[in-house]
Structures are given as structure tokens and as C-alpha cells.
UniProtKB/Swiss-Prot annotation:
Monomer. Its EC number is 2.5.1.75. Residues 27-30, 151-155, 232-237 are annotated as: Interaction with substrate tRNA. Gene3D superfamilies: 1.10.20.140, P-loop containing nucleotide triphosphate hydrolases. One of its GO terms (molecular function) is ATP binding. This is tRNA dimethylallyltransferase. One of its GO terms (biological process) is tRNA modification. The lineage of its organism: Bacteria, Pseudomonadati, Pseudomonadota, Gammaproteobacteria, Alteromonadales. Keywords: ATP-binding, Magnesium, Nucleotide-binding, Transferase, tRNA processing. Transmembrane segments: none annotated. It comes from Shewanella baltica (strain OS155 / ATCC BAA-1091).
Length: 296
């Protein structure tokens, strides 16, 4: 695990080449076909050195949830283990790691009809009245969700109307945790400025590699838009907006780099509270030796 631009892929490739391992990607951007440059997808040469599972498995117009990832990752892990190899999970989508390790609550999928029914009630009675409903059926969620947060309030009521159980009840029940021994590592530069510089350098390289042309091709399809999860990936949104004429080139670069730095900050926030985590410094000599020693 680690923030974007921290050197996860390079270390994973070194591990795969020198030991009996196979790589599974844990990245919500790498799953999409046609999104290669802006997602920092491993190059053809890198994939030849160490093939990655769970990349290029969805079209950008399709959704992919943490539950989807968990099911796919467990299937890949089982196959790798059956071959007598060790799976190495590499990426920066912390929600995927958490879902894989801890399991997920069995919340029902969205129901557009019930959601529309709730919205109609809110239009008639107001969200305060619906918050009172939630307090009656799920006081714990009502305490946590403000009446002025219609999205979360609607979802809590929707869950109850679909399942007959409160969100609090359902979130107390999770699927079984991962049935394997796991050794967890995070890699990051020691200094925040180093990471910020790496992010800016990598975005400049992406632009030279044709990132804007990649986004131009995605826009030209005609079936993609900025509300899709794929197009909300950092860099893609800013390039799309630049191509739409919303701001100039320098502003696009500034916004994309800033968004990527914010992503890295969120990733590090997750990692600092992550239990049983072994830390490695980006670019440090002996990282592979340290990693293998901890795995014994």
C-alpha cells in the first residue's frame, strides 16, 4: 500500500521477478480499459516483467464497487495460491484493501423506485420530517446524519424500506474476513515535499506521454461524462474540463497536481491509522530485503 507516486509498482515488480509471486492490482483507476496514461498503468515492458491481475477489467462507462473487487480479488488469490505461488496485492485504493481484509456489511443495492418515493415525501413534508422517521427506526444513524444531508438520510431510509432492518443493524454484520495470513506494508517518502515533487514530475511526464490525447479519445466516444466514477479519477476530470475550455493549460496542470496531492494526503491519513502496518521509505536501499525478512 502507499500514496500515489510512492514507488509501489517498482517494488512489486522487483518482488515478482525475484520470488515466486504474482501481482494483484488494488487500484480503482487501473480497472478501466483505455485509461492507461493518466492512471499510471504499468507499461507493456513492466507487465511483461510482472503481469498484473485486475487491470483492464471494466469499460469506463461501467461501475465497479468494493464488493466487486473483494469477490474478484479472493478468486484471484485462490487461483494464485493453488499454483503454489504467493499473491502480492499492490495499490492505493484503501477502501478496497479494507473491504478485502475485513469483509463488507450486507447493505442492499439502491432501488430507484424507493429512492424516488423518499424524494417525493421530502418534497411534500421536508427532510426534517424524514429525519424524525429515521430517528424512530434507527436512532444511532439519526444521531450521525444531519437533517441537511439528504443523500445520506435518503440512503438510510432506503436501506430500511428495502430490508426491514436499520443501517445500524446491517453494518454490525460483515462478511467473513480474508481467510489468509497477511503481512501488510506501506511505502512512502519520509518527507511530504519529496512526495509532492514526485507527483508534479509524474504528471508532467504523463502530459508528454499523451495524456491529453488519451482524454480527447475518451471524450470523443460520446458515452462518457464527468459524473462517472472513471472520469472522477484525478487528472482525468481536470484534463476533460481543460478540453471543454473551462480554464487554460497552466490552470489545468495546477488543478490536476493539487487534486493528486489531496488524494495522496487522504491515502496517508488512512495508512497512519492502519493496524499492523510495516513502513518502508520510498527509494531506500534494501526495501526488498526488509520486506522479505518481515514475511518469514
Amino acid at each position: 500500500m502507499g500514496p500515489t507516486a510512492s514507488g509501489k509498482t517498482a517494488l512489486a515488480l522487483e518482488l515478482a521477478e525475484k520470488h515466486n509471486c504474482e501481482i494483484i492490482s488494488v487500484d480503482s483507476a487501473l480497472i478501466y480499459r483505455g485509461m492507461d496514461i493518466g492512471s499510471a498503468k504499468p507499461s507493456v515492458d513492466e507487465l511483461a516483467r510482472g503481469p498484473h491481475r485486475l487491470i483492464d477489467i471494466r469499460d469506463p462507462r461501467e461501475s465497479y464497487s468494493a464488493a466487486d473487487f473483494r469477490a474478484d480479488a479472493i478468486a484471484e488469490i485462490e487461483q494464485i495460491v493453488s499454483m503454489g505461488k504467493t499473491p502480492v496485492l499492490v495499490g492505493g485504493t484503501m477502501m478496497y484493501f479494507k473491504a478485502l481484509l475485513e469483509g463488507l456489511s450486507p447493505l442492499p443495492s439502491a432501488d430507484e423506485a424507493i429512492r424516488a418515493e423518499i424524494q417525493a415525501e421530502a418534497d411534500e413534508k421536508g427532510w426534517e420530517a424524514l429525519h424524525d422517521q429515521l430517528r424512530d427506526i434507527d436512532p444511532v444513524s439519526a444521531e450521525r446524519i444531519h437533517p441537511n444531508d439528504p443523500q445520506r438520510l435518503s440512503r438510510a431510509l432506503e436501506v430500511y424500506r428495502i430490508s426491514g432492518k436499520s443501517m445500524t443493524e446491517l453494518t454490525q454484520t460483515k462478511s467473513a474476513p480474508l481467510p489468509y495470513d497477511v503481512v501488510q506494508f506501506a511505502i512512502a517518502p519520509r518527507e511530504r515535499k519529496v512526495l509532492h515533487d514526485l507527483i508534479a514530475q509524474r504528471f508532467a511526464i504523463m502530459l508528454k506521454q499523451g495524456f491529453l490525447e488519451e482524454v480527447t479519445e475518451l471524450k470523443a466516444r460520446g458515452d462518457l461524462h464527468l459524473d462517472l466514477p472513471s472520469m472522477r479519477c484525478v487528472g482525468y476530470r481536470q484534463c476533460w474540463q481543460y478540453l471543454d475550455g473551462e480554464f487554460d493549460y497552466d490552470t489545468m496542470v495546477e488543478k490536476a497536481v493539487a487534486a493528486t496531492r489531496q488524494l495522496a494526503k487522504r491515502q496517508l491519513t488512512w495508512l497512519r491509522s492502519w493496524p499492523e502496518l510495516n513502513w518502508l521509505e520510498s527509494g531506500a536501499e534494501g526495501n526488498l530485503v526488509t520486506l522479505m525478512r518481515q514475511c518469514r
